[in-house]
């Protein structure tokens, strides 16, 4: 309905002298079904050329003032700093087997943890192996983190095959 109102407003402003055209267009819009309107919109968007799009983008970027840019960048960095990836659908998290570090920008997705191989570089894994650097017991496969290392769990018995 909002789209219809916008179309009517634009059409009215362009053809303010021709009342008969306005009435005809208004009647057509009122009688048009939603599918007809969506088809018309799709046809219009398909007819837009690349040059028209690039011109529109250039005009939009020219309208951004220099004072707006630092504010936008500052707000974006604050949002990204709060974005600690725990959900696999999030933008900047790493999946299993990918490079990771224990920084904000290279976290593992979901329940994956970063198994460090060096000073800050590692690989995302399901759980940390024995003697790997840990902070929480839940990160270790053994579920036992002592003195920042994953330790053997004496309560878990390994059954030989």
Swiss-Prot record:
Signal peptide region: 1-13
Gene Ontology CC entries for this record: extracellular region
Keyword Signal: yes
Residues carrying a glycan: 15, 19, 31, 43, 47, 59, 63, 75, 121
Disulfide cross-links: 127-141, 134-145, 140-150
One Pfam match: UPF0506
UniProtKB keywords: Disulfide bond, Glycoprotein, Knottin, Secreted, Signal
Keyword Ribosomal protein: no
Compartmental location: Secreted
Entry's free-text remark on domains: The presence of a 'disulfide through disulfide knot' structurally defines this protein as a knottin.
Family: Belongs to the UPF0506 family.
UniProt name for this protein: UPF0506 protein SJCHGC02965
Source organism of the structure: Schistosoma japonicum
């Amino acid at each position: 309905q909002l789209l219809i109102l916008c179309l009517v407003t634009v059409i009215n402003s362009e053809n303010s002298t021709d009342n008969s055209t306005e009435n005809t267009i208004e009647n057509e819009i009122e009688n048009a079904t939603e599918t007809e309107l969506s088809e018309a919109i799709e046809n219009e968007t398909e007819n837009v050329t690349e040059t028209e799009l690039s011109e529109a983008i250039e005009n939009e970027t020219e309208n951004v003032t220099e004072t707006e840019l630092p504010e936008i960048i500052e707000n974006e960095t604050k949002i990204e700093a709060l974005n600690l990836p725990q959900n696999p659908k999030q933008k900047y998290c790493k999946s299993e087997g990918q490079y990771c570090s224990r920084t904000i920008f290279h976290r593992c997705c979901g329940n994956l943890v970063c198994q460090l191989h060096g000073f800050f570089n590692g690989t995302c894994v399901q759980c940390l192996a024995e003697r790997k650097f840990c902070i929480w017991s839940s990160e270790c496969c053994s579920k036992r983190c002592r003195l920042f290392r994953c330790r053997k769990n004496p309560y878990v018995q390994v059954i030989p095959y």
